[in-house]
């Protein structure tokens, strides 16, 4: 587990609600709840108690684990070219002693070497289509704009995303994406509140002929996610996506369910929020600030 201070989230709900939505819709992500931390009997604060993504996590959630876990390494670069061995080794979070990234290199090379229908066949072979589409559905509904769908300019014509892991199945040619770090989710649902994270396009749209462009209050450069070889290959499945999206709204992402969850969870942490505000002053939201941000979650989903 890890304890996340949630300094960027004045509602203190983004991680718990976001991971709940992913997990409840069949996407393998960490469990998360709230924790009140005391050190030597003294109250330290309210934290998100979020399951850490590491070897024990993959052992627990992937049929015994054993496969490579990579943090923030995308199989091809933003120009669609394959990655080098050192790149994948640098992202390894399990099996570092062996550092056998040959399967990731093979996947990367196949993505590099193929286009159109052949590319789609490669992606479908290596990534479970239903799970990836479900991941897209939840990611876009909760506006996880600081995650794998946001390709920020790294330098020149190269763009990188972050806040995710890949799990490589040891006995199959398969990879599964695991979203991570959801504290900025939910912010841009109604309007672009965060000056850094907003994504211009819908997940299946492209802008500026797949070249970088400036967007948002800070005018930062980004690149459309659908220009990526993996994400772009799913744009042919928009009807499947829409079907899953409707199911997600019917089952989970609706005001009745969300309000019920927030009512229950906010009652659990109200006193802790107030106590933290008294303890840390301006470094923590006041009870009134917290209530205002909770109200935004009540009214945001659409």
Where are the regions a protein language model picked out?
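Short intrinsically disordered coil segments
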Residues: 1, 62-69, 182, 193-199
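Conserved NTP-binding catalytic cores of kinases and kinase-like/nucleotidyltransferase enzymes
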Residues: 1-17
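Internal "kinase-insert"/substrate-recognition segments embedded within catalytic cores
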Residues: 5-6, 24-30, 42-147, 176, ...
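Short, solvent-exposed loop/turn segments at secondary-structure junctions
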Residues: 8, 55, 183-185
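Zn2+-dependent metallopeptidase catalytic core
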Residues: 13-27
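Short, acidic/polar N-cap/turn motifs at the starts of alpha helices
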Residues: 32-34, 163
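Middle-to-C-terminal accessory/interaction subdomains
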Residues: 101-150, 154-163, 171-301
């Amino acid at each position: 587990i890890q304890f996340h201070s949630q300094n960027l989230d004045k509602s203190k709900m983004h991680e718990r609600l976001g991971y709940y939505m992913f997990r409840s819709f069949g996407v393998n992500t960490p469990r998360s709840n709230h924790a009140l931390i005391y050190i030597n009997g003294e109250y330290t604060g309210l934290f998100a108690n979020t399951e850490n993504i590491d070897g024990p996590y993959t052992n627990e959630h992937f049929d015994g684990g054993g496969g490579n876990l990579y943090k923030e390494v995308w199989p091809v670069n933003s120009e669609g070219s394959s990655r080098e061995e050192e790149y994948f080794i640098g992202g390894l979070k399990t099996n570092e002693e062996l550092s056998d990234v040959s399967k990731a290199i093979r996947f990367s090379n196949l993505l590099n070497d193929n286009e159109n229908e052949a590319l789609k066949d490669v992606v479908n072979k290596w990534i479970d289509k239903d799970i990836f589409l479900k991941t897209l559905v939840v990611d876009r509904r909760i506006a996880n704009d600081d995650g794998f769908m946001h390709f920020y300019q790294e330098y020149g014509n190269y763009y990188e995303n972050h806040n995710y892991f890949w799990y490589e199945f040891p006995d199959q040619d398969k990879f599964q994406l695991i979203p991570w770090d959801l504290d900025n989710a939910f912010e841009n649902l109604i309007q672009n509140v965060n000056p850094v994270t907003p994504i211009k396009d819908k997940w299946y749209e492209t802008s500026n002929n797949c070249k970088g462009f400036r967007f948002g209050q800070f005018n930062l450069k980004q690149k459309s996610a659908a220009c990526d070889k993996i994400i772009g290959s799913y744009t042919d499945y928009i009807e499947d996506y829409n079907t899953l999206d409707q199911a997600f709204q019917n089952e989970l992402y609706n005001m009745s369910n969300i309000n019920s969850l927030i009512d229950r969870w906010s009652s659990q942490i109200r006193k802790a929020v107030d106590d933290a505000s008294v303890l840390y002053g301006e470094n923590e939201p006041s009870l009134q600030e917290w209530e205002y941000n909770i109200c935004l979650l009540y009214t945001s989903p659409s």
